[in-house]
């Protein structure tokens, strides 16, 4: 089973880059995951954008702390099994924290969305939530993937190793900076601390450069706007043995329309 994971899509530049990439390469993959919580001008996701992603070949959209920025998506999240928000939010919050779908070949595959607690808003324990959901989902499929939307690399490493051998793939999102620590852990789980961002490289993690510089210089509130130009797609491609649920290969992707795949 070959899985594509695309990092946090930031605004229209990120969406356009994703569309071009999928038009060229989506047939190479059995299952496609994107993180869409920054896809609507950097804050949240709309119904129109979610539908566009799915029409382009995305199988499931994961979320994070910006999942609720657009209120129109609330009911959509309740009714769809193809868009997720972090599972460790309080009981009664709209949406779903995990889903079990099928890849192109009919293999069952699950995605769990979780959010970290270090340097972020208080939520339920991601470790205990992960353990509960993994134990539940493993009764249905061994092919389990976790998107951990978190700030601290240490928290990501800890939860990745805590889950090692019980899931197929653990990857981080949120920082918008792709890390170079992809590997297969001791018990067969693919791991990377952060898959990176899909959007403009001209700003600061997807936001207009001048705005961010002014924020640092003055400490005054700024209106954040999405950066444009020199777009890139960051993510990973992963091969999973669908019979055992073990990761066989994990590879970073860094791609632009003008330059193609970068090493």
Task: Cite the ranges covered by each PLM segment.
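Acidic, metal/ion-coordinating pockets
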Residues: 1-263
């Amino acid at each position: 089973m070959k899985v594509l994971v695309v990092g946090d899509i930031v605004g229209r530049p990120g969406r356009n880059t994703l569309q071009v990439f999928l038009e060229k390469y989506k047939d190479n993959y059995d299952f496609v995951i994107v993180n869409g919580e920054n896809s609507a001008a950097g804050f949240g996701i709309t119904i129109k954008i979610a539908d566009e992603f799915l029409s382009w070949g995305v199988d499931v959209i994961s979320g994070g702390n910006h999942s609720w920025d657009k209120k129109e998506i609330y009911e959509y999240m309740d009714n769809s099994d193809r868009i997720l928000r972090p599972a460790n939010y309080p009981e009664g919050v709209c949406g779903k924290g995990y889903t079990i779908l099928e890849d192109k070949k009919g293999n069952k595959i699950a995605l769990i969305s979780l959010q970290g607690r270090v340097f972020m808003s208080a939520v339920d324990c991601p470790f205990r939530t992960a353990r509960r959901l993994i134990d539940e989902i493993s009764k249905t499929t061994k092919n389990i993937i976790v998107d951990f939307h978190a700030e601290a690399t240490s928290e990501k490493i800890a939860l990745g190793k805590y889950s090692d051998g019980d899931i197929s793939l653990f990857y981080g999102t949120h920082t918008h900076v792709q890390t170079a620590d992809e590997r297969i852990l001791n018990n067969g789980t693919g791991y990377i601390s952060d898959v990176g961002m899909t959007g403009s490289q001209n700003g600061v993690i997807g936001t207009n450069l001048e705005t961010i510089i002014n924020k640092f210089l003055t400490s005054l509130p700024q209106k954040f706007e999405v950066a444009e130009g020199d777009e890139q797609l960051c993510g990973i491609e992963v091969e999973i043995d669908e019979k055992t649920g073990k990761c066989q290969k994990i590879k970073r992707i860094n791609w632009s329309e003008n330059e193609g795949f970068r090493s």
